[in-house]
């Protein structure tokens, strides 16, 4: 499915198919999604602005709108492979279609995702085995506090990729070109420095067991971070994408690159 267009991936999700989007529609920008009531939207937008590394804003919808300006004929209620619904800060259910939950006061936020720069990493010879294995990137809750806004606060979540020592500098250079997709790493080589006790046991996604000692764990900020903040805020209702199952836009990766 890596040769599909963004529209084709959205249509598969709209038809009820449930799948991980890592490696799909390569070259198209993928985003994290957060949907919350209007009364909480300003504080959350400020939270994103204060924490641009894990929460890079791509688009904010008007209340009640469900079509993205960056995805032709899209429907945010149906075009994600799987959603997570939270009520009063607690997980309620998963769904492949949130039309029945939709409200006119819902505000949708699209946030940058590191899947965007993965294509560039692979072009430069970096192996990301979870693509071939149909698995999800490892994600960890760190000990790093995010900057508070109103009721929103929490720990930063990161993604993990094991990078060959000789390609470490190149991987940092590549990801630095994508500040709206988390940019440069948060930490390189020392998992415990950011509170990760066991780098082989992620909080979300699938474990990545390195093949040799030349691979170094590298951590990038992750768009699952706001899900943690919103859960702790105990909003009456929140809807997000499921980790690793993103929204595909029609934007191209090169549209996001700064150099």
Each language-model region and where it sits:
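Aromatic- and glycine-enriched beta-alpha-beta binding-site module
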Residues: 93-150
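Metallocofactor- and cofactor-centric catalytic cores in central/energy metabolism, strongly enriched
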Residues: 1-111, 123, 158-259
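Short, flexible turn/loop "capping" segments at secondary-structure junctions
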Residues: 25-26, 149-153
């Amino acid at each position: 499915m890596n040769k599909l267009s963004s529209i084709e991936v959205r249509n598969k999700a709209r038809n009820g198919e449930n799948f991980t989007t890592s490696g799909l529609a390569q070259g198209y920008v993928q985003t994290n999604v957060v949907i919350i009531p209007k009364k909480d939207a300003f504080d959350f937008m400020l939270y994103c602005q204060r924490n641009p590394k894990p929460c890079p804003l791509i688009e904010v919808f008007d209340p009640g709108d469900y079509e993205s300006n960056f995805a032709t004929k899209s429907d945010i209620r149906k075009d994600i492979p799987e959603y997570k619904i939270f009520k009063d800060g607690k997980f309620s259910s998963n769904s492949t279609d949130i039309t029945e939950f939709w409200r006119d006061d819902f505000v949708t936020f699209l946030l940058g995702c590191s899947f965007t720069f993965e294509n560039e990493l692979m072009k430069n010879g970096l192996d990301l085995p979870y693509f071939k294995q149909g698995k999800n990137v490892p994600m960890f809750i760190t000990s790093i506090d995010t900057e508070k806004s109103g009721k929103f606060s929490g720990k930063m979540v990161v993604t993990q990729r094991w990078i060959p020592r000789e390609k470490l500098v190149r991987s940092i250079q590549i990801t630095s070109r994508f500040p709206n997709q988390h940019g440069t790493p948060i930490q390189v080589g020392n998992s415990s420095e950011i509170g990760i006790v066991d780098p082989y046991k992620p909080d979300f996604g699938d474990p990545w067991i390195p093949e040799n000692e030349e691979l170094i764990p590298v951590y990038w900020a992750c768009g699952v971070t706001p899900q943690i903040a919103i859960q702790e805020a105990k909003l009456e209702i929140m809807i997000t994408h499921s980790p690793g199952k993103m929204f595909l836009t029609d934007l191209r990766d090169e549209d996001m690159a700064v150099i």
